[in-house]
Amino acid sequence: MDSKMIAHNMSLTPTLAQWKKLRLKPKHTFVVGVLARPTDDISEETLRKTNVYKDNWFDKLAINHLSKSVQAATGISNNKSGFDSLVEAATVASQKFNTTQQQGIILDALDRAFPKPILSVIRRVMPPSKLAREYFAVFTTIFFAWLLGPSEVRESEINGRREKNIVHIKKCRFLEETNCVGMCINLCKMPSQLFIKDSFGMPVNMVPNFDDMSCEMIFGQEPPASTDDPALKQPCYKLCKAKKNHATQCLS
């Protein structure tokens, strides 16, 4: 696979409306992976070791809400509960739909999960600024631990000033449960970047580290073009559940 295979008539930074059109009338498969190095370099111990989560009532409510939103977007329901239900809904999306459709499905699910009036209010009262970037970082660490796992706010430099605008996710819960690079890219990174930018006017670059399953969300930073994004040049894991159980080529 080669990233040059991306359709030339497809924008590298499409709007949310354009993604919905692509989802409804897909014409091309969006190539999001390039074989860059052997998967033997990835520690199997890292892949096999999983954290144990004790979800509270809020976590369970949020997980169920997002899972139901994904199921509604795919039109395929499941009878599992808790985080297993969310992983199953995401796995079905990765098996039944091409990569362009997968990203569109998650955008649809996020539209269902978060009321538009609330998003509009947040966008109006918090235009892009140092305060907004730091607010989004803190908010993410507090209210999305159920999805991302433990995280912390870190500093970076923007226009010569230090800001606490980075969320460092120590080991992504979604990635460790799926063991799938393709699901990380198509069902999390790409649609989340677009949704946050389109909903709040806030650019964010999500930088996963597939060696240790950590990730950084850098608020205020535009993500690189698809052809230049290192995350899209990572082969999937040998222990990828989608590939192992369903012979799925999860990156194409």
Curated annotation (Swiss-Prot):
Q: Which InterPro entries match?
A: D27-like, D27-like_C
Cofactors needed by this protein, per the record, are: Fe cation
Q: Where in the cell is it found?
A: Plastid, Chloroplast
Q: Does Ion transport appear among the keywords? A: no
Keyword Phosphoprotein in annotation: no
Please give the record's induction comment: Induced by phosphate deprivation. Induced by Rhizobium lipo-chitooligosaccharide elicitors.
- Look at the named UniProt entry and state the broad enzyme category this protein falls under: isomerase
Range annotated as the organelle transit peptide: 1-43
The misc remark on file is: Roots of plants silencing D27 exhibit a strong reduction in strigolactone synthesis.
* Its job: Involved in strigolactones biosynthesis by catalyzing the isomerization of the C9-C10 double bond in all-trans-beta-carotene leading to 9-cis-beta-carotene and providing the substrate for CCD7. Strigolactones are hormones that inhibit tillering and shoot branching through the MAX-dependent pathway, contribute to the regulation of shoot architectural response to phosphate-limiting conditions and function as rhizosphere signals that stimulate hyphal branching of arbuscular mycorrhizal fungi and trigger seed germination of root parasitic weeds.
Name of the featured protein: Beta-carotene isomerase D27, chloroplastic
Instruction: Specify the taxonomic lineage.
Output: Eukaryota, Viridiplantae, Streptophyta, Embryophyta, Tracheophyta
The coding gene here is D27
